[in-house]
Amino acid sequence: MNGPRQSDGGIVPKKSPNKPQGAEGMEGRLPVKGNEQERPSLRTQSRDEGKQATLERIREAVKRNKEAKLTSLYHHVYNVEHLKAGYFGLKKKAAPGVDGETWAHYGEKLEANLADLAGRLARGAYRAQPVRRKYIPKPDGRQRPLGIPALEDKIVQSVAAHILSVIWEEEFLGFSYGFRPGRNPHQALNALTVGIEQKRVSWVLDADIRGFFDTISHEWMVKFIEHRIGDRRMVALIQKWLKAGVLEEGQWTWSEAGTPQGGLISPVLANIYLYYTFDLWAHHWRKQKAQGEVIVVRYADDCVPRRLSE
C-alpha cells in the first residue's frame, strides 16, 4: 500500500518532553467483563483491512521509538482505498456543508470522485472549505455552535484523524476518556463513581474549560502536533482545516483560533491539545505537589479531580 521509497519507519529523533509513559489503562475503574466495543461487521472489516494494516504499521513505528517524529505519513492520506474507507465511515444522512454535497450524491460517481480527490491531495491542490455554522440548543438554554465540514473535508479528516489517534494513543494518560477508541462516557462515570463510593474522598472539583473548542491556539496546536509528526505536508494539511474559516448566513469569518465542534478532526486535536496543556501538568502536580492521593477523570473539556484522605 505504500508507494516506492516511502516508509512508515521514517522517523527522526526528537527531544524528550520529560513526560510519563503513555498507553495507560483506564484509571480508577472497576474491571468490566466482556468486550465493551461493538464488533464491526464482516463487510466493514473487509473494507477497512488496508486501512487497519496501515494504522498498525504506524503504531509499531511509534512503539519502536517513543521519542521520535514520524516523517512519512501524508501519502497514507491520499491513498484511494483509505479515502474510500473514510467515505463509508461517514453518516449517510448527515447535513451537508457549504458545498451542499450529500453522501448519496457523491457516491454515485464514487471511484471518479475519490480518484480526483486523491490527485488533488497528492499534488497539493486540495483546498479545505469553510465549515457551515449551525446551532443546537444546550440543556441550559444556550446555543452550542457546530461547524459542518464539506463532504470531501469530512472524508480526508476521517483518514487523518485515525492516523493522529493511533500515534497519540500510545501517549495519552489513563484518566482521559473523551473521544478515544474503546472509551465512552459510561466508563468515565464509572471511574468517578468508584472514586467517590469506594475511596475516602476529601473533596471533589468539577471543572469545565469555558469555550475550549473556540479558543484553542493554532500556534500551540501546531507545536504540539510537531512533537510527534515531522512530515511537513501532514502538518500543513491540519493547518488548512484550522484556518478554513466559518460560513454563517453567507458571511465568511477567518479562523484566528479554535477548531469547530462538528469536524471529524476536532476531537483528536482537542485531546492532543489537552494532553500537553492539562494532562501532563495534572499528572506532574499530583505526583510531585499534592498531599495525599489525587484521582483525575477527564472527558474532553470536562474534568473532575478528586483528593483522597491520607
Regions found by a protein language model. Give the residues of each.
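Duplex nucleic acid-engaging cores and interfaces of nucleic-acid transaction enzymes
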Residues: 151-159, 185, 203
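Conserved polymerase palm-domain catalytic core
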Residues: 113, 120-135, 139-140, 163, ...
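Conserved phosphate-binding loops in nucleotide/dinucleotide-binding enzymes
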Residues: 145-146, 150
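Short alpha-helical scaffolding segments that buttress acidic/His motifs in well-ordered protein cores
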Residues: 86-90, 159, 237-242
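Non-catalytic, polymerase-adjacent accessory regions of viral genome-replication enzymes
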Residues: 1-100, 104-111
